[in-house]
Amino acid sequence: MGASCLEDRPLIKLVFCLKRLPHLSLEKFQTYWLDTHGPLVRSHAAALKIRRYVQSHTTENLGLNQAAAASRGAPGGFDGVAELWWDTVEDFASAASTPEGREAARILLEDERRFIDHSRSPLWISVEHPIVER
């Protein structure tokens, strides 16, 4: 999804590379993220003006992540990546400006603290530039 249907403008995207809390196994982390946090995000999406939310879960059992990182001399990977899209910068910036939006943001952050190690989980705001789409 490279552009919104509104005048073909690029969507604003938050990318969040996640590391689990040390006491959680990868399986417990991913199960909680998918089955508990995912529905929680869905329930607050309208209040936060979120257009799209995608979870990408690491597949450690294949050993491919370690091989890919080792081939580049890269550090160890993440346990997953969350991606959230908004139609405009204004939508993103104003998402928590209403009482409903502030409460939704508070609830989601409180839940994240149950399974995400925020100190090792970088996030950033971006605009996509699709290069290949088939």
Across the structure, where does each feature detected by a protein language model lie?
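Macromolecular interaction modules
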Residues: 2-134
